[in-house]
From Swiss-Prot:
Gene Ontology cellular component annotations, sorted alphabetically: small ribosomal subunit
PANTHER family xref list: 30S RIBOSOMAL PROTEIN S20, SMALL RIBOSOMAL SUBUNIT PROTEIN BS20C
Role noted for this protein: Binds directly to 16S ribosomal RNA.
Keywords: Ribonucleoprotein, Ribosomal protein, RNA-binding, rRNA-binding
Source domain of life: Bacteria
Segments passing through the bilayer: none
SUPFAM superfamilies (alphabetical): Ribosomal protein S20 (SSF46992)
Protein name (database record): Small ribosomal subunit protein bS20
Amino acid sequence: MANSPQAKKRIRRNDRRAEVNTARMSRIRSFVKKVETAVAEGDKKAAEAALKEAQPEMARGVARGVIHKNTAARKFSRLTKRVASL
């Protein structure tokens, strides 16, 4: 149990950050899912549009430290390859 005021403050701060980071990850997943759904339906135009929206969202996640840059690069590369194969 946290006893010092600093430790108590860190717990409050960590809880707030965890909530924000969870929302960011959820948002990234939603954008990625839009691309995957469009690819599954075979809609190239929608997939390209969704990919164009997902890329900056993943980059924002990298900048905020929510997702590792290599993970984002790998996901984007795989999504791009799937969209190009349509």
